[in-house]
Amino acid sequence: MKVFVLLTLAVLLMVSADMAFAGFGCPGNQLKCNNHCKSISCRAGYCDAATLWLRCTCTDCNGKK
């Protein structure tokens, strides 16, 4: 039961994060990722270490929850 609850929480946390799933410069060009996120009304973007810097993750996106 504990494993199920932990897995459910992990999935909910992943779904609730504002992420752009395509590369958008990652890996190697974090500035391109940041510019992409700003272009879609997010505050900033970075190449996510949890995905070995392959995914651009946007933060503080307006109107997306």
Curated annotation (Swiss-Prot):
The superkingdom listed in its UniProt entry is Eukaryota
Q: What is its main location?
A: secreted
Main function: Antibacterial peptide mostly active against Gram-positive bacteria (M.lysodeikticus, S.aureus, and the marine bacteria, B.stationis, and M.maritypicum). It acts by selectively inhibiting peptidoglycan biosynthesis through complex formation with the cell wall precursor lipid II (1:1 molar ratio) thus inhibiting cell wall synthesis. It does not disrupt cell membranes. Is noticeably more potent than Cg-Defh1. It shows no or limited activities against Gram-negative bacteria and filamentous fungi.
> What triggers its expression?
Constitutively expressed.
Which amino acid positions bind beta-D-GlcNAc-(1->4)-Mur2Ac(oyl-L-Ala-gamma-D-Glu-L-Lys-D-Ala-D-Ala)-di-trans,octa-cis-undecaprenyl diphosphate, per UniProt? F24, G25, C26, H36, C56
Domain characteristics, as noted in the entry: Has the structural arrangement of an alpha-helix connected to a beta-sheet by disulfide bonds (CSalpha/beta).
GO MF term list: lipid binding
* Native organism: Magallana gigas
The protein in question is named Defensin Cg-Defm
Reply yes or no: does the keyword Secreted apply. Answer: yes
* More info: The Cys-26-Pro-27 bond is in cis conformation.
The record's keywords, sorted A to Z, are: Antibiotic, Antimicrobial, Defensin, Disulfide bond, Immunity, Innate immunity, Lipid-binding, Membrane, Secreted, Signal, Target cell membrane, Target membrane
- What does the similarity note say? Belongs to the invertebrate defensin family.
The cysteines covalently paired via disulfide bonds are: C26-C47, C33-C56, C37-C58, C42-C61
